[in-house]
C-alpha cells in the first residue's frame, strides 16, 4: 500500500514537471519567434512615440555600443517621407531629415523633394532645402519663394510626433522575412483604415486610395540592437504600378558626426 502511495506521488510529481516544462517551452517558443523579436526590438524606439517636443531627445539616451567614441553623447536622426505616383512611371518623394546632436544640443537638417523614375529606379533630381530647429520651430536657412512649400516645411511634423504604437504588441500573424547573412529582418502586418495611425496619415497626406495599408517593420543589423544598423517603418497603401503610395519613418540613435 505504501508502495502504491509512493508511486502515485512519483507520477504526480512527474506530471507536474512535464506541465511546467511544457509551459516554459511554450513561452520560450513565443519569446524566440521572429515576430516577437522584431516587435520587441522596435518597441524600444516606438514606445517613445508620440514625441511631443523633439528637443526632449537631447536628454534621451539610445542604444550604445563600441562604435561610440569616448565622451560622445550620440545623435538622434529622424526622417519622415511621403512617396506617391502622380504620373505614370514616376514617383514623387519628399520629406524631412533632422539630426539632433546631444553633444552640442543643436538640430540641423533638410527638407528634400525628389522624383524617382520607376523604370530605372533612379532619381532625376533631388532638391535639399536646409533648415534647423530652434526651440520648437523649424527655421529655414535657404530662401523658398514658393509660399505654399514654405508653409509646408515650417509646419512639418514627423510621424514620430503624432503616431502612437501602444497597440504594437496586439498586431498578430505578421508576414516574416529574414536574411541572417545581412542580417535583416522584416515583419508586415495588415492594418484597417480604422487604425488611429492610419486615420492620422490620411489627414496629413493626400492619400487617394481607399485601400487599407500594410505596416512594414524593417531592421538592418543585429535584431537586439546596433548603432551601425537601422530600423524603419513603412505604411504601404498601394504597391500597384503607377499608384504607389507610402509613408516612411525612421528614428535612429548613433555616433555623432565630428563635423556636425
From Swiss-Prot:
Where does the UniProt annotation locate this protein? Cell membrane
**Lipidation, kind N-palmitoyl cysteine: residue numbers?**
23
Q: Does the keyword Lipoprotein apply?
A: yes
Output the InterPro entries linked to this UniProt entry.
Csa, Csa_sf
State the PROSITE patterns in the record: PROKAR_LIPOPROTEIN (PS51257)
Per UniProt, which keywords does this protein have? Cell membrane, Lipoprotein, Membrane, Palmitate, Signal
Residues covalently joined to lipid (S-diacylglycerol cysteine)? 23
The membrane-topology field of this record reads: Lipid-anchor
* Gene Ontology CC: plasma membrane
Major place of residence: membrane
Give the signal peptide, or none: 1-22
Q: Which NCBIfam families does UniProt cross-reference here? A: SA_tandem_lipo (TIGR01742)
| Family per similarity comment | Belongs to the staphylococcal tandem lipoprotein family.
Protein name (Swiss-Prot/TrEMBL)? Uncharacterized lipoprotein SAB0390/SAB0391
